[in-house]
Amino acid sequence: MEQILKYLQEAHPKPDPLLLELEDHGRRDGIPVVSRETGRLLSTIVHAMQATRILEIGTAYGYSTLWMALAQPRIGRIWTIDPDIRRTEIALSYFRRAEEDDFIEVFNTPALELLENFTHRNLDVVFIDANKAEYRAYLDLAVPMLKLSGLVIVDDCLSDLDAMRSFNEYFLNHPDLDATILPLGNGTGIGARKR
C-alpha cells in the first residue's frame, strides 16, 4: 500500500505552495492535518459540486479549509469552527496570503455550542474533523443543515477503530444519509443527504 501511495503522490501535480508550507508548519508544530489524499478529495468534491456553502467543524491551522477554498467558486463561503484562537490566527494568516480570507469566516467557540444556534441552511458540504467524542452530536446537528444531496464528509473514521466503531456504525446506518467509508487517509466517511 505504501508503494501505491508513493506512486499516487508522485503522479499528482504538486499542491499549491501555500498548502505545502502549511503541511510543513503543522508537522513542525505537531498539529495534525488531513492527509494530502483527503485534501485532494475535498478539493475534487467542492470543485465538482461547485459548492458555495461549506461548514467545517475543526479548523486547526486551516489546511483542509484552504484545500476547499482554493477549489470553491469565488462567490462561495466557508464557515469554520475551532475554539483555539492561537491555531485559528495561524490559519487566518494563510487564508490572507492565499487571498481567500474574504470567503472564510472563523468562529472561535466550541462547535456544539455554535451548531445549536447556527442559522445557515442548505449547505452543500459539511466537513467534520474535530473532537472525535462529539462526532455523533456534530452529525445530528449538521445533517438537517445540508441541502438535499448535500454531502457530509468525516475524517478519521478508521484512525482508532475501537473509539470510532460506534460512530461509524451510526454514520453508515443513518436514516437520512446514503453513506460509505473509504480507506483514504485515516478513513474518510462520505454521506449524501437523501431526505
Label the predicted regions.
Residues M1-V125, K132-I153, C157-R195:
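A short alpha-helical cap/connector motif
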